[in-house]
Amino acid sequence: MQNKIVKIGNIDVANDKPFVLFGGMNVLESRDMAMQVCEAYVKVTEKLGVPYVFKASFDKANRSSIHSYRGPGMEEGLKIFQELKDTFGVKIITDVHEIYQCQPVADVVDIIQLPAFLARQTDLVEAMAKTGAVINVKKPQFLSPSQMGNIVEKIEECGNDKIILCDRGTNFGYDNLIVDMLGFSVMKKASKGSPVIFDVTHSLQCRDPFGAASSGRRAQVTELARSGLAVGIAGLFLEAHPNPNQAKCDGPSALPLSALEGFVSQMKAIDDLVKSFPELDTSI
């Protein structure tokens, strides 16, 4: 199977290329924090030679509670994204939730993301595809890896073949997620070689059945990320925070920003090793 390459400026995203770190914070909490987090990622990835894309949401439209923080909104969020691009020269990925957001967001950022809960909403998928932007599709927790091929087909039918697929875990009973490592190769096959990345942070979520926010398993972020890269994928999707216990969204799953360099260094070593191996023919 031929691995497709999706280009984001001078970055090649492909399953057989060096892994790309899609890293940042869950939601924009302030302009100053976004600058702090982005600068930390840029310093680490430049030092280690890892291709990098900044990620954050301007609106967490799917929060469990009406009282939870959602973000600064599209207008203010896009201003922050533009300042990050101007200051650090980074590429940026963010999610959209409404049709009217697609083009204005695509005019500023480099990748627009289709949220997992909305991945089968055809009108939204079509509106995103028609912007011509690179699209990152989050696999819904309730969908099998093979079903991602149908979403890819919708996007391609609109004339856009710049598609990245992202696994963020699968429902395992109530209020728990697991990651099926075999699913990465299934998604590659279902999409005819599209780049597949792994959202390790959100895969660590676990819900309090009576609570208004997700808990998380931050202590297992390294082992889960190692496992994903060992399969041979195009990138990791990661959230870090200066003080995860004070984060306004998904802090229990976020990596402390102070641990970022050690984490990325390990991931690069694993990715380099795995992709140095020749592919084995196991067919009969």
Curated annotation (Swiss-Prot):
Chief place of localization: cytoplasm
Pathway info: Carbohydrate biosynthesis; 3-deoxy-D-manno-octulosonate biosynthesis; 3-deoxy-D-manno-octulosonate from D-ribulose 5-phosphate: step 2/3; Bacterial outer membrane biogenesis; lipopolysaccharide biosynthesis
Domain of life: Bacteria
Designated name of the protein: 2-dehydro-3-deoxyphosphooctonate aldolase
Record EC number: 2.5.1.55
Lineage per the UniProt record: Bacteria, Pseudomonadati, Pseudomonadota, Gammaproteobacteria, Pasteurellales
Record key words, sorted: Cytoplasm, Lipopolysaccharide biosynthesis, Transferase
Key word Cytoplasm present: yes
Family: Belongs to the KdsA family.
Enzyme class: transferase
Chain segments annotated as coiled-coil in the UniProt record: none
Gene Ontology BP term (one): keto-3-deoxy-D-manno-octulosonic acid biosynthetic process
Enzymatic reactions: D-arabinose 5-phosphate + phosphoenolpyruvate + H2O = 3-deoxy-alpha-D-manno-2-octulosonate-8-phosphate + phosphate
InterPro entries: Aldolase_TIM, DAHP1/KDSA, KDO8P_synthase
Record-linked Pfam families: DAHP_synth_1
Annotated HAMAP family: KDO8P_synth
Transmembrane segments: none
Organism for this UniProt entry: Haemophilus influenzae (strain ATCC 51907 / DSM 11121 / KW20 / Rd)
GO cellular component terms given for this protein: cytosol
Single GO MF descriptor: 3-deoxy-8-phosphooctulonate synthase activity
Compartments where located: Cytoplasm
